[in-house]
Every structure is written in C-alpha cells, then in structure tokens.
Amino acid sequence: MSYQQQQCKQPCQPPPVCPTPKCPEPCPPPKCPEPCPPPKCPQPCPPQQCQQKYPPVTPSPPCQPKYPPKSK
C-alpha cells in the first residue's frame, strides 16, 4: 500500500467545529423617555354671565337747554 492510500483510508475528520461566537449581550431595551405629563388643561373659564348684547339702556337725562335761559 502506498502512503497515499493509507491516508485515504483514514476516516474523514469532521471539520473543526467553530465555537459559536458568543452573541454580544442584547442591548438593553432603550429607556423610554418618561412620558410627558399630560398637558395641564387650562382651567375652564368661569361661566360668563349672560352678557346682554347691548348695555342696558340708561334713562336719558331730561333735556337740558344748551344755554341757560337768559334772565332779563
């Protein structure tokens, strides 16, 4: 038997098993920024008393002559 044949008869060696690369630790989940506090609703305006469209009519003052009557 030649040297070559002997080598061929050797059982094939399985390829060396590569050690599985260690997975890098998974990143910790990103920290969620704290949720914004709910926006503070501006306080509702106090209910407005019904405003009359027109200001109340003030009684017109009695007519006054522009000029006082000339005393004779």
Swiss-Prot record:
Record protein name field: Small proline-rich protein 2B
Q: Where in the cell is it found?
A: Cytoplasm
Please give the chief subcellular localization of this protein. Answer: cytoplasm
The biological processes this protein is annotated with in GO are:
epidermis development; keratinization; keratinocyte differentiation
Q: Which organism is it from?
A: Homo sapiens (Human)
Q: What is an example of a Pfam family matching this protein?
A: SPRR2
Q: What does this protein do?
A: Cross-linked envelope protein of keratinocytes. It is a keratinocyte protein that first appears in the cell cytosol, but ultimately becomes cross-linked to membrane proteins by transglutaminase. All that results in the formation of an insoluble envelope beneath the plasma membrane.
Q: Whereabouts are the sequence repeats?
A: 21-29, 30-38, 39-47
Keyword Repeat tagged: yes
Q: Does the keyword Membrane apply?
A: no
SS bond list: none
Q: What induces it?
A: By UV irradiation and carcinogenic agents. During squamous differentiation of epidermal keratinocytes.
Q: Which InterPro entries match?
A: SPRR2
Where along the chain is composition biased (Low complexity)? 1-11
Q: Where is this region: Disordered?
A: 1-20, 42-72
Tissue expression per record? Suprabasal layers of squamous-differentiated tissues such as epidermis, esophagus, tongue and trachea.
Domain of life from the UniProt record: Eukaryota
Q: Which family does it belong to?
A: Belongs to the cornifin (SPRR) family.
User: What spans are recorded as compositionally biased (Pro residues)?
Assistant: 56-72
